[in-house]
Amino acid sequence: MYSGSKHGVRYLLKQNGTLPEGIAAPTCQTCHMQEGNHEVRTAWGFLAVRLPMPDDEQWAKDRATILQALGVLDPQGNPTGRLDVVKAADLARLTQEAWQKERDKMERTCNQCHSLNFARAELEKGDDIIREADRLMAEAVRMVAGLYQDGVLPKPESYAYAFPDLLTFHDAPTTIENKLFVMFLEHRMRTFQGTFHANPDYALWYGWSEMVRDLTEIKELAAELREKHN
């Protein structure tokens, strides 16, 4: 992701002497370890979920669905014990102030080489792609949740609710939920991380396009499971 990004390409060209020594070519450390430590923290965090909910009504619904699949909210939308774990470990930004603090920090870092207007516009592209990726992701989650709701999939004993649980990771009990996990933790992540790192090729072909394919396959698997159930 980094080596094919605009920053990564500049660094490699600088390294092989194509670009002069004094030219800007940010590395991972430049943007993510600004204070010289390993606290690699961003506004959106590792999973690109946060609170409060957005003003965009559709996006708010989609994010709520994803938070339900992460077990942070129950199927009725109420907070669970997992939210307390997230709070205790500070895994995500849970207030607008906390999110804005990290965004401001990143803007200051970008401003070392870019204008603030350019930096903000690029970061907003990342925000926008998260919204679009969440649209696909939430549709897939609801597809699998419907299988549980209609009794097509039996609730596993290890599940707190009859609802897909993304935190089972690769130990998900069904093929369709394994597909859902990969869609979330691999392809959705590539989509937004590739965008934030100015690597559109990575974001599109290894992220977004894979998410679209995942959703198509999940729809087909869901239809097959329903047909067998009936």
Predicted regions and their residues:
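Primarily the internal scaffold of c-type cytochrome electron-transfer domains
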Residues: 1-229
